Amino acid sequence: MQKRYISSVIEDDYRNWELGRIAIDAGTGAGKTTFIMNVLLPYAIQQSGDYHCADPCTRVRILYLCNRVPLKSQIIQAVFGDGKEHWVDEYDRLKWEMEDCLNFQYIDVWTYQKIQREYKKSPEDLKRVLDRYTYIICDEAHYFVGDSDFNDDTKLAYLCVEKMVSSKVVVYMSATMQLLLDQWRDDGTLSETKYYALPKQDGCVKELRFYYRDRERDLLIESIPADEKILLFVTRRSILENLKKQYGDKIRCYCSANNRGGAMDKLSDCIDRDGRLKSQILAATTALYNGVDIKDRTLKHIFIEQSDPLEVIQEIGRKRPTDEGDTCKLYLRGKGSKELVYLVT
């Protein structure tokens, strides 16, 4: 069956979007970011008129919000749209490259954490900045409910965005936004004419197994052929440290630089620009659970030790199949297994 993308559901509706909330409910790999970059951004540029003649203050501008630094880097690469690798880790160099790219006159990319920081410094100054934008894109919108358990500041970002619903086109999009949808429907603020859904399509998982102890996981990994790659999501940086000692050069380990122990391997040392793993094993915390597309046919095994369904769905979605035959085995840590079976059936 031919794969469908969210642009085929939205069609030309975006041309007539009025102020308010838009909800895009579609799985990983459904083309949500592609729609923004290849359809909405060119439309904003077109509506702004001639770049050299138009008043910069009248430009139609987009603010793209996301929840993780790796995703921000990926979005910045997508805004360039030239297929080249840009120096997203070197701000001074990146700044010059962005100034030479016309697209960045119409779109800015922030993390939700930046919204939170700016609001704490001055709500009034933040509002003046946000007033410049016509469209607010909330990518990985499950951040507002998924991260709130351990980060009370997420509600600040959500409140800031919600205040703009009456004066902006605010686009929420995620593969796992059911809690938000339920809330909006309960309070009567979700218009079904502004809700775009693409049913979940068959994924890449061909077999599901459970394990319950570290030793079981280690034995499973040791049984995997050397030419088959492994993606392993763990819950703590300390586990990454132990895995690094255990597997040596066979493994790369990725976690947030904001972690108490700091960063480990750079993302660019873990995954190449084409989405292929640079080692047999890539182990990571939830810092990698979105914002990274792995397009590697040799990635045949995904181990997940989280039990939150939102996180599990996102982590499975890091593998982007290149065709119908590009499949993998999924291994889930035993905790919460009964609740998680539905994710891959």
Language-model features, listed with the residues they occupy:
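A short beta-strand element within the Helicase C-terminal
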Residues: 293-305, 330
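Conserved strand-helix element at the start of the C-terminal RecA-like helicase core
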Residues: 61-72, 223-246
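Conserved SF2 helicase motif VI
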Residues: 308-330
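Conserved helicase ATPase core of P-loop NTP-dependent helicases/translocases
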Residues: 258-284
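SF2 helicase catalytic motif II
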Residues: 127-159
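Conserved helicase ATPase motor motifs in RecA-like P-loop NTPase domains
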Residues: 25-30, 140-143, 157-185
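Interdomain hinge/linker at the junction between the two RecA-like core domains of SF2 helicases
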Residues: 177-223
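Inter-Walker segment of RecA-like/P-loop motor cores
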Residues: 80-123, 267-269
